[in-house]
Amino acid sequence: MAGTAATVFRNVRPYGAERPVDLFAVDGVLAERLPDGAEPVVVEGGGRIALPTLVDAHIHPDKTAWGEPWYSRRPAASLPEYVEGDVDLHHHLATPLAERAHRLLAHAVASGTRAVRAHVDVAPAYGLAGVTGLAEARERLAGALDVQLVAFPQHGVRRTPGAGELLAEAAASGLIDAVGGIDPAGFDGGPDGEGPAQLDLVFGLAERHGLRLDVHLHDVGARGLDPLRDIVARTRAAGLAGRVVVSHAFCVPEISGDRLAALADELAEAGVGLTTVAPSAHQVLPFRELQARGVRVGLGSDGVRDSWSPYGNADMLHRAHLLGWTTDARTDQELADCFALAADGGADLLDLPRVTLRPGSPADFMLVAGECLPQVVVDLPARELVVRGGRVVARDGRHLG
């Protein structure tokens, strides 16, 4: 059929099924069969496992030194010290931000990622260089990777003169998808820990410009829980259900039982989602309990090879593996849950359709060697083929763009 893009992926095993099947991709969507007259491209799967490509719900590609000469990090013990390190690294790196971000995100594609939510620093130290640089990288990767941009006031708005104005400029630029925030009662709070000023600003910008909102919340105890409940109340009042996310939320793993259930019900009713980067056993979100009560939860990479840490690789299958490690996942179902958070959790947060590998699903998947899904989460096999919209976009760990 003229004008129809059709591909047959022969001999693949969706989710590690025992019997191989053929997957038919027609105009970017999986179909039950090919249309009459189609002249498909044929790709041999060789009995490999087909798995949905993944969604990175929280990454900082503007800060990365991925692919750069080794950078020796200085010790840092507080958030202000880490922020100073960001500025130092930004001035230390010769490669333009747009190129570094593209390099990292192309690697993410080759690792099996189909979409990211990218937090980009907006501060007087950089102006809007991060926003424009990531917008350039996003354009270069169009068709292989969806990129949602968050204008993130890493340096704070109360504590950093001019940051609020830059955030407003970013919101009006048409380049971003969401406005960010950071620790409104702690790092960016007033002398007594009050934080309404920042939330007034970011909620106002989100409403005025029709943007989403994604707030970093590292604070624990009341300094974390009180702003979290304030965000829930503001989300309800503004009618922003499904458009607000709180990242990290380290205060949530501190509570359990009835307190956790009550908070989860508040989050679910207001439509406020959460993201975790599985940083440690005591800071990872209790995602199963949250999801069981209707809370949307996503998984992300966070910083990758930046001034904060020499670690990270923008590989969401590896992040699912780390989630399994930090939550002590041992059974097949527990390991599959970790993969599902990387595949479906982020898709739900970013309002993307889930990949089911059934007819009607986006033709977004990767082919890997292995026996079954739980083994893949543990063994981390090479991503031999990555498919986006029915088109091969990466092969053997290399983006083909």
Residue ranges and their predicted role:
Residues 233-244, 288-370:
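His/Asp/Glu-enriched, well-ordered alpha-helical/loop segment
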